[in-house]
Amino acid sequence: MPAMSEWKKARNIAIVLSAGRGSRMHTQTPKQYLDLCGRPVIAWSLGAFEAFDGVDDVILVSSPEDIEYCRSEIVEAYGLSKVRRVIPGGAERYLSVWEGLKEAKRIRDQGQEGPADGGYLFVHDGARPLVDSAILERTLADAGKYSACVAAMPVKDTIKVSDEEGFAAQTPDRRLLWQIQTPQVFSFSLVYEAYRKLIEEGITQVTDDAMVVERETEVRVKLTEGSWKNLKITTPEDLEIARLFLRQENNYSAGR
């Protein structure tokens, strides 16, 4: 496994996704821009990468209509100097990631330091504001070992598979089931080529980046310990839980 100093020689880039609208929040404001203890949700997510030495550049992928807001009210307002680009996303998550990957390749091709084939790519949901340095360190370490990993937690509840009529059809072994989070971290060349093939094939049924790597390569994706605090803001209840966690930590003035 490479030492942290070796990871820093390569250029590591994070794509932070902020193009979703979040209809389940029942608000006009997209969930990633809602206030969370004095700052927008997305500002917390970006702040975690800003403070993490293992990432050099951040690409923020936004809805086209929100780009100027993100630049002025998020990136500039909170001094997020690692955010090199704010770009428009696609109609689906995987298309937004592909736009981010193409932009990341342009950054790498502009003569930046680091080996041409080296470096790692983080993909993170902007609506996961409580990601912390420990998760980022663990996922980067496992990406160095295995070339592909995702933050994840073992499920707590029994999971049922339903039939088409809504009846329980199967009960998988809970010991084998994990709830997937972000970041998802990959060797840059691996994930770029996997996405390129996926787009070329016209595949559209994709729910996360690990699924693309699983489908298009023979590399196994490592499940890396995330955190139950690393929740995704999807419903009003999630926002209240995130506020509770931040208040307990008493660190929201520091911006992490």
Would you name each region that the model predicts?
Residues 5-7, 177-256:
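Conserved alpha/beta core of the MobA/IspD/sugar-nucleotide pyrophosphorylase nucleotidyltransferase superfamily
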Residues 13, 56-59, 85, 122, ...:
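A structural signal for isolated positions on well-ordered beta-strands in alpha/beta enzyme cores
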Residues 6-70:
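N-terminal glycine-rich phosphate-binding loop and ensuing alpha1 helix
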Residues 52-54, 76-82:
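Short helix-capping segments at alpha-helix termini
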Residues 35, 130, 171, 185, ...:
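Short aromatic/basic micro-patch
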Residues 79-91:
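Conserved donor nucleotide-binding strand/loop of the catalytic core
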